[in-house]
Amino acid sequence: MTVTLTFWGTRGSIPVSGPATARTGGSTPCLTLEAAGAPLTILDAGTGIRALGASIGNRPLTGGQLLISHTHWDHIQGLPFFTPLWHQGTSLTIVGPRPEHASLASVLERQMEADVFPVPFAQFAEPPRVREATAEPFDLPGYSVRPFRLNHPGVTFGYRMERPGMGAFAYVTDNELGPGHHFTTSWRDGLGDWLSGAQTIVHDSMYLDSGLPQRRGWGHSTASEAVNLAADAGAVRLVLFHHDPERGDDAVDAMLASARELAARRAPGLEVLSAHDGLVLHL
């Protein structure tokens, strides 16, 4: 049974616009999984979620589920502009890790306090239900989910998702693969085990190899690191994601070409794509 994966936002850190980024797009992270018999499942609530809401229109969203990887701005800043939440009859459950210094619900609510936003969280027509997840596996309607703690400042989860008839899918945003932050070699081994056998991996490719030494510990990876990880995991498809806001379309094309050259040497069967706003894949 086909599962449709749609990319609504693929930039990291801050949304961008203009002719230099028109093909890749400039919205921050938001993806959806759609499958017959399963509720709409959303991954992250960056500014891309606004376009998702516009596609739903004035209809309420019933039984929707939103997985938050972490609460940095670029992954939650679109939530106030998700129009279904302003329509009666919408039901949305938000699931994500507990941040280090507050509850998940309080962080989502605080970004809509009066000092920074005109309308409070409580005034959504149908305020979402918020549930905190641990790193233990759990089930959502339609999917089995295995979280994994990523190498990124704060508490950040990647999600491996499976369902009958769908190749295992892994969403690995905001993740530093090289040395940095506070994780060890055993963490990297665990990441490889967690990804093993995943058919499609969406992975952070924020930085270029040339600029990485100055950004160690910031919690992001390069396309070449992502290719090597996907090759080691035996993946069929790698989607490069979380593009640097300073990277124009031509630079994204060059990054992709270099990544494909590396993949041809490391894992000839690995398909490498670069995410762009509006990309649709089938799992």
What label would you give each PLM region?
Residues A168, E176-E271, H276:
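Cap/insert and terminal regions of metallo-dependent hydrolase folds
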Residues T173:
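Conserved SAM/AdoMet-binding glycine-rich loop
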Residues M1-A170, G178-H181, G192-D193, V252-L283:
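Binuclear metal-dependent hydrolase catalytic cores
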